[in-house]
Each structure stands twice: as C-alpha cells, then as structure tokens.
Amino acid sequence: MAERFPAYTFHPPALFVASFVTHLESALDGTHLPARTLQTTHKDRPLWVRYDLGAIGDALTKDQLLGRPPTMWRYRELLPPEPGASIVTLGEGMSPVLPCKRLGAQVGLNDLWIKDEAQLPTGTFKSRGLAMALTMAKELGVDRVAIPTAGNAGGATAAYAARAGLEAYVFMPEDAPPVNKYEAALAGAHVFLVNGLITDCGRIVQEGKERMGWFEVSTLKEPYRIEGKKTMGLELAEQFDWDLPDVILYPTGGGTGLIGMWKGFNELAELGWVDADALPRMVAVQSTGCCPIVRAFEAGARFAKPFEDPETIASGIRVPSALGDFMILSALRESGGRAVAVDEGHIRNWMQRAASTEGVSVGPEAAVCVGAAERGADEGWIGPDDRVVIYNCGAAQKYPDVMAHELPRIDKDAPIDWDRIAAGG
C-alpha cells in the first residue's frame, strides 16, 4: 500500500459543519426515536444511529478525505456530532494495517493482515467508542458517567472523561488485569473492584443511576460507541483503497466493534464507495472458556443464552451475556460469516507466535483470532489466497500476568556459559 498518511502535527478536528443524523432506531423492532435527546435503549435493547446517506453522498466524495488529518474524525459526515460540537479527542484513529507474511505462512494464508488498534491513545480499540460516547454525552449535557468493564474500557473511559472534564465511575471484576485497574485510577476515575463478573458490575451501575445521577456508557447501553467503533471499518476500507478484505476475524465479547464495522460497510456500500456484493465475511472469535455467541450461532438462535462459569485469560471477551447478541448474530449471517471458539489453552502460544514472527504486540483477545485463522485455513472456510484481517484490540503489555515467562539468569560472578547463551537459555 502507498503511504497515504504522512506525519503531521495533531490539532483537534474542526467543528462539525453539518450533521446528517436523521433519527435513532431500535435494533430490536425498528422503532424510531429522536436523535438529539439523551437516549439509552429501547425495550432494554440497543439503538442504531441513522443518517441521510443520500445527502452525505451529495456532500462528500472519497477524494475529499485525502486532505484531512488521519484520525477517526476524518469521516465526520458519517458521525453523529452536531455542528459546533466540541470533540473529545486524544488523536485516536488511523491505526496501521500490517501485512503479516511470516505469520500467514505458518497458518496457511498468503494474504494475512493485522490492524493494530494497540497503537491508539489508550492502547486499545476502546479509544474510538469512548471518544465518541463522551463527545456525545458532553454535548447532551451529561457531567457524570459510569461504566462496568472487564478492563480496557475502564482505562479509556477514565482518560476521555478526564479529557472532557467529566466525572467517571468505573466498576470492574477484582481479577481484571492490574494495568487496567491502575490506569483508570491514574486518570482520575473512581474505580471500584467487584468480586464477580462484568455482569455483576453492570448490575451495580444500573442500580445506581437514580441515586448517583450518572449516565451509563457501557457496551450498547447508549447508541454512540457503535459509531466510534465503526470507524475501524471505514478506515480499513480506505487503507485498502476501498477494496474490502474477504474475511475479518474479530475477537468478540460485547461485539460493538463487529456490529459497528458491519454497519459502516453497509453505509459505504449504500454510498457506492465499496462493492455491495463483496463485503467481508465477518467471523466472531471466542474462547472455549466463554463462547455464548458460538453456541447461539451453531443452534441457529436469534439470541444467545448466558454462558455459565466463564473462564478465559482474554478478559476482554469474558462476556457471558452480550446485550447486542442478536445484532452480532445478524451481522455474521448477513455477511456469510460464522462464529468459532478456539482452545483456551493455546492463547499464550498464539500471542507469542504473532509477536515473535511479526513483532506485533498482540493481546490475548486478538490471539484467539490467530488460532481461528489457522483453523479456518485447515478446515477450508478460509481460502489460502483470501485477504484476511485480524483486529488486534489491545496491546500485550496490558496483560503482564499473561505475558509472564521464566527467564534464564546469569550470575555476574560465575564464568559465562556461552554454549547456554547460544542455545537461548
């Protein structure tokens, strides 16, 4: 790929000059709701943001994007902020998409790529959704937010709340990765550890709404995180010169990114910017330790049953019950994709394989996608020449306990054993 985004000095994006949002829409039953009031869910299920795509097509061409800064806000016509909105940003967006020839050769794929979201401001893809959610929350008059999180969303919420000047409350399982706990507290959030799962944290946030007066920004409990996450797909299309890959492997917990990308691809198709008959096959990847979406997909169900006793070192996909389960399953089926569960016991190996062959700091969530790539090639549902993109949702450095290795030591006073060094330890 040509270098399309040279180095630049970051400036906050210009104030939005137009908004093409028409309404919000229930993902469950299609009910329309007004867009410019504070909304959460409809019948306890998520909302879509809908746009006047015809007007966007008249106002924007692909070529106009070329002169804009390489952040997710370059797609402002396809995003919800109103004219005059103050954007809450740390420069998020345009993460690199990296060719992985050696890793691809190992798993049997000739055209494997990793889109490395670990390079975003908070070290994870959560930067996108929380930048958008906090922008819209502030625009709509919120001054206090709360979130239940398995880890990474807590740090991102804290960072963007600090950037926005909002008060943040973060609730996470007590066994969440230590880095996630400390980064959220460092950014000034009120952090509480719960001796349970993310669902238990969610119950606390729900019960505290009236007493504490906070607005919940958890996965799919408000409509705007999807819009931030969909920019992963808009970027990918632009980075591949509007020729989308054949397969996207996505580590799936709450599924906001998968849902958002599929929405974005369909919006691009309606604009005529990508081929509507060549959209990617979306693959939701989970661990055998927590795979409610896989079970529902295989059963042909619209909704997933809660997964009992989930256990996985990939904390970001330890989600036993996803609010948007039916939206995930719909995207998989519409795209001709699938849901797969890979062996929990191999996650560390897949992390190391990606890092040692390509130098990419792959977290345990993305590591499951390395396993899925190999399985897809072996089983034939990914062709050897298919263009395949793995989303690396967060840096391995977020998980020091998962990365831990027993390293060989050298006694400074002993003779140096060069044979041992040559053998690698």
Predicted region positions:
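PLP-dependent amino-acid enzyme catalytic core
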Residues: 5-425
